[in-house]
Amino acid sequence: MSELFTTHNFDVVCHFAAQAGVRYSVEAPEVYVHTNVLGTQTLLEVMQQNNVTRMVFASTSSAYGTTTQVPFKETSAADQPVSVYAATKRSAELLAYTYYKQYGIQTTCLRFFTVYGPWSRPDMAMLKFAQAITAGQPIDIYNHGDLRRDFTYIDDIVEGFVQAVHTPLGYEIINIGNGHPVKLLEFVELLEAQLGRPADRNLLPMQQGDVYETYADTTKAKELLGFTAKTDLADGMQVFVDWYQQYYQSQQTI
């Protein structure tokens, strides 16, 4: 990494690198600490050594942990994470603040809310559910479906990130979300309708490390970045389903 920074000039670092996902962090916490905490500190240290003074960091709504204030505001407490993943991403935010105070590295931490869309990670609910429903296999629904998620389409996430890249702000934490949480069972019903198949629902208790609700207050994103999510869940899911049927199902016929 040092060689990269000494041979190239960077105006802004876009920091997406991470070990992602709540559930795997229960099984392999050391991987999350090494990647998300030590990796971020290493990056910040190389930045300050090479006079790179701006970063936009992909953080997560999981940082809010057990907060009961909804919608989630950036001023809400974020000191009770319920997963190692959340703790490591929050730690990275705090490291960025320290480097801002010590070295003047400006960082905008964007807390993403339940990102979905084409080319999603294999462990994300929409893709896992689509694959299982198509194959006639059961889907695991935690807390018996009594969960709410602020699903945010990938194109909206990208738009918010690009706006942050072009907007120096010192040090800020900003929610990037849709602002309209949906019950998990409603999400499943919509996916069933768009796939044209019913799901075999396996209703389970709350999963370790999970939270009941995510719900973004997007006021700050509007004020500082001029950002508002444009894609509702039905429209975004339809784009996902079209992609899934074209890409995944076509692979099965080869």
Residue ranges of model-derived segments:
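N-terminal Rossmann-like NAD(P)+-binding domain of SDR-like oxidoreductases, especially those catalyzing
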Residues: 1-115, 155, 231, 243-250
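Small-residue (primarily alanine) positions within well-ordered alpha-helices
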Residues: 17-18, 58, 92, 160, ...
